[in-house]
Design a protein with these regions (language model features):
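Beta-strand-rich structural segments
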Residues: 275-279, 379-396, 443-447
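Short, solvent-exposed loop/linker segments at the N-terminal edge
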Residues: 265-271, 371-381
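Substrate-binding/catalytic cleft of secreted carbohydrate-active enzymes
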Residues: 8-16, 24-240, 255-266, 270, ...
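Low-complexity "stalk/linker" and mucin-like segments enriched in Ser/Thr/Pro/Ala/Gly
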Residues: 301-316, 365, 370, 408-427
Length: 505
C-alpha cells in the first residue's frame, strides 16, 4: 500500500511500538501522519519530528529556504502535541553550511517561543551543531571522549552494522522466511547494541532502533529486513527481546506489559542445542520432557548493562533424545518444554512449547489491535493464516501456498502478480491484507492450500464485521460504462458466479 496507510493502521503501528517497550519514536525522515501523532499522545510515546530530507543538498539559496519553510510548517502542525520531545530541523545525513544550521535552530525557537519548548537535535559532526544545538546525535562512547559535547547525546539510529554499503550484509537484518537461527542472531545482535547504550555516562540519554518494520526501499534491491516486525507486522524474536526490557511492574492501560517469558526456540530437528529465553522476571525455570530435567537461572540485571539480559540454557535440546520418546517409547506428548518466569519466589508467567508434528490444518486470525475495521473503502487489516498440527502448534518449516477468498463487504489487496494471493508460507504463516468496502457488514475470509488433497492441511474460515464510517462520503457515484462493457467486466471477474482473485483459478 506504500504511503497509503489508513488512520487505523497508524494507531496500530504506534501501539505495536508501545507493546515492544518503545518510549520514543523518531519519525525519520519526514513527519508522520497527524493520526500517528494523535496515537502517540494517547499511548504515551515521545516523538522526535524530523523535517523532510535525506542525503541531498543543493547550493541554490532557494533550496535552503524551502527546507526552512517545511520546518516552520512542520512545527506549526505538531507543536500542540504533548508527545513532541524534539524537533529535527535539519536534513538527515547531509552536509550543509553553518548559516543553514543556525537558521534552522532559530526557527524552532521562533515557532514555539515558550518555556519547556521541544528541543532541537542534529548530528554532532555537522556545522554549528555541537556549539549551538540543544541535543546532539552521536554514539555510545562519544560521551567519554576528550572533545565530548556539553549537551546530552542521543543515537538517532542504532543496531546497524553492515559489512559495506553495497552488499548490506548485516546480522541485525533477518527475514522471517529465513527461520529460527537467523531470527535469534538478529535478536541477540540488537540486544548487544542496546546493551552498549547502557555502558555510558549520564550524558548519553538513549537511542532509536532503525527500523521497527521491514519495508521496501528504492536504493537497494533487497527489502530492509532489520525490523522487529516484518512488513505485515508479524513479530520476530527481536520484538520479544525488546519487550523483555520493560519492567515486570510496568502497567499501561492500552499496551502489552507486565511479567513475561519467551522461548526463542522451535524444538525442530534443526534447532540449536542451547535454548535462549527472554524475560523480565527475577529468574527463569526451564523444564523439558514433563519435568524430567529442570534448570533455573537468574535474569541478570547488571548495572551498566541492559535491564534484563537474555538467559541462555546450554545443551538442553537434543533431537535424538527427543526422538527416543516419540519414536522408541511412542510417547510424543512428553516432548515438551515449559518455561516459567519467577518473581519473589512465585511463578508469574509461563510458556509451553512442543515440536510441531505434521501439517494438518490452517488457522486464521485477524490482527485488529482492538481497533474496528472501518467501512470507508480504504481501511484494511492483516489476516494471517498459520499452518498447524493437530494440537495447534505452528509448523514453522511448512512450505505451502495459501489461497485466500473473501465473501461479504471486503476485498483482498493484491493478487498473484505480486505474490499476494496465493501467498507463500514463511516461518509457518501467510498474511493477507483485507480492505473494507464502503458498506459496513460481515466479512468472511477463507483460506486453503493451493494444492488440496486428503493429506493436505484442511481449510479455515474467519468471520468479522466492519463498522460504519464516522463521516459521510462527499462524492456522487455515476455509471459511465456502457451495458456491454459492464457485462464483460462482470464475466471477467467471476468464476461460477463467485469473485476470484486475479491469477487464481
Amino acid at each position: 500500500v506504500g504511503n497509503a496507510l489508513p488512520n487505523s493502521q497508524q494507531w496500530r503501528d504506534a501501539k505495536r511500538l508501545r507493546d515492544a517497550g518503545c518510549t520514543i519514536i523518531r519519525t525519520a525522515h519526514y513527519p508522520q501522519d497527524p493520526s500517528f501523532m494523535d496515537a502517540c499522545d494517547e499511548l504515551g510515546l515521545f516523538v522526535i519530528v524530523a523535517t523532510p530530507g535525506w542525503q541531498y543538498w543543493n547550493k541554490d539559496l532557494q533550496f535552503g529556504e524551502l527546507v526552512h519553510r517545511n520546518t516552520r510548517e512542520m512545527i506549526r502542525r505538531d507543536r500542540n502535541h504533548p508527545s513532541v520531545l524534539m524537533w529535527e530541523p535539519i536534513l538527515n545525513e547531509t552536509r550543509y553550511p553553518l548559516d543553514f544550521a543556525l537558521k534552522a535552530l532559530d526557527i524552532t525557537k521562533e515557532e514555539y517561543p515558550y518555556p519547556g519548548r521541544p528541543v532541537a537535535a542534529a548530528d554532532v559532526h555537522s556545522a554549528g551543531v555541537k556549539e549551538h544545538y540543544d541535543v546532539v546525535y552521536g554514539w555510545p562512547g562519544d560521551d567519554e571522549k576528550e572533545d565530548r559535547p556539553e549537551q546530552c547525546i542521543f543515537t538517532r539510529e542504532f543496531g546497524e552494522n553492515v559489512d559495506d554499503w553495497y552488499a548490506h550484509n548485516n546480522d541485525n537484518r533477518a527475514s522471517r522466511s529465513w527461520g529460527e537461527h537467523p531470527l535469534l542472531v538478529q535478536a541477540l545482535s540488537l540486544a548487544k547494541s542496546y546493551d552498549e547504550m547502557y555502558r555510558t555516562t549520564g550524558l548519553f540519554i538513549g537511542g532509536a532502533q532503525w527500523h521497527p518494520f521491514d519495508h521496501q526501499r528504492g536504493y537497494h534491491p533487497d527489502p530492509y529486513w532489520g525490523g522487529i516486525y516484518d512488513a505485515f507486522r508479524q513479530k520476530k524474536y527481536a520484538y520479544e527481546m525488546f519487550r523483555s526490557q520493560s519492567s515486570a511492574s510496568l502497567r499501561h492501560p492500552l499496551a502489552e506489559c507486565g511479567p513475561m517469558v519467551f522461548v526463542a526456540h522451535e524444538m525442530s530437528q534443526f534447532s540449536d542445542k542451547d535454548v535462549v529465553v527472554f524475560s523480565n522476571c527475577d529468574s527463569v525455570r526451564l523444564s523439558v520432557y514433563d519435568g524430567t530435567k529442570t534448570w533455573t537461572k537468574p535474569v541478570v540485571h547488571a548495572k551498566g548493562h541492559l535491564p534484563n539480559a537474555p538467559v541462555v540454557f546450554e545443551n538442553v535440546w537434543d533431537f535424538w533424545e527427543a526422538r527416543s520418546y516419540s519414536y522408541t517409547q511412542k510417547n510424543w506428548q512428553k516432548v515438551n518444554m515449559i518455561v516459567e518466569g519467577i518473581i519473589n519466589g512465585k511463578v508469574v508467567c509461563t510458556q509451553k512449547k512442543m515440536p510441531s508434528r505434521r501439517s494438518t490444518k490452517l488457522r486464521l486470525y485477524a490482527d485488529t489491535g482492538n481497533v474496528n475495521l472501518v467501512a470507508d473503502g480504504s481501511d484494511f487489516i492483516v489476516v494471517v493464516a498459520e499452518v498447524t498440527d493437530d494440537n495447534g502448534n505452528v509448523r514453522r518449516l511448512a512450505k505451502e501456498n495459501i489461497v485466500f477468498t473473501v465473501e461479504g463487504e471486503g476485498d483482498i489487496i493484491g493478487d498473484a502478480t505480486i505474490g499476494a494471493n496465493p501467498r507463500a508460507v514463511e516461518f509457518g504463516s501467510a498474511p493477507v491484507l483485507i480492505r473494507s468496502t464502503r458498506k459496513a457488514g460481515k466479512i468472511k475470509v477463507k483460506a486453503r492450500v493451493l494444492f488440496e488433497g486428503t493429506q493436505a492441511p484442511t481449510a479455515a474460515e474467519l468471520e468479522f464485521e466492519s463498522v460504519p464510517a464516522e463521516f459521510p462520503f462527499c462524492y456522487e457515484e455515476r455509471e459511465i460504462a456502457s451495458a456491454a462493457v459492464r457485462t464483460r467486466l462482470q464475466k471477467e471477474n467471476t468464476v461460477d458466479g463467485r469473485r476470484t482473485p486475479k491469477g487464481v483459478g
